[in-house]
UniProtKB/Swiss-Prot annotation:
Annotated gene: TNP1
Sequence segments annotated as region (Disordered): 1-55
Modified residues (Phosphoserine): S9, S40
Biological role stated in the UniProt entry: Plays a key role in the replacement of histones to protamine in the elongating spermatids of mammals. In condensing spermatids, loaded onto the nucleosomes, where it promotes the recruitment and processing of protamines, which are responsible for histone eviction.
Superkingdom: Eukaryota
InterPro entries (alphabetical): Nuclear_transition_prot1 (IPR001319), Nuclear_transition_prot1_CS (IPR020062)
Phylogenetic lineage: Eukaryota, Metazoa, Chordata, Craniata, Vertebrata
Protein name per Swiss-Prot or TrEMBL: Spermatid nuclear transition protein 1
Length: 55
């Protein structure tokens, strides 16, 4: 079980870099920072991360 858990954690961390799942998570803020600038994009990402954390 411990190994499985470790693998899962690793997979999540690795997929965070580039994975279709991120597309869905980024989809919401995509519209946001699409209107704004690069700075807004960083802020949106942070907000999204916090929002997901709260969920």
């Amino acid at each position: 079980m411990s190994t499985s858990r470790k693998l899962k954690s690793h997979g999540m961390r690795r997929s965070k870099s580039r994975s279709p799942h991120k597309g869905v998570k980024r989809g919401g803020s995509k519209r946001k920072y699409r209107k704004g600038n690069l700075k807004s994009r960083k802020r949106g990402d942070d907000a999204n991360r916090n929002y997901r954390s709260h969920l």
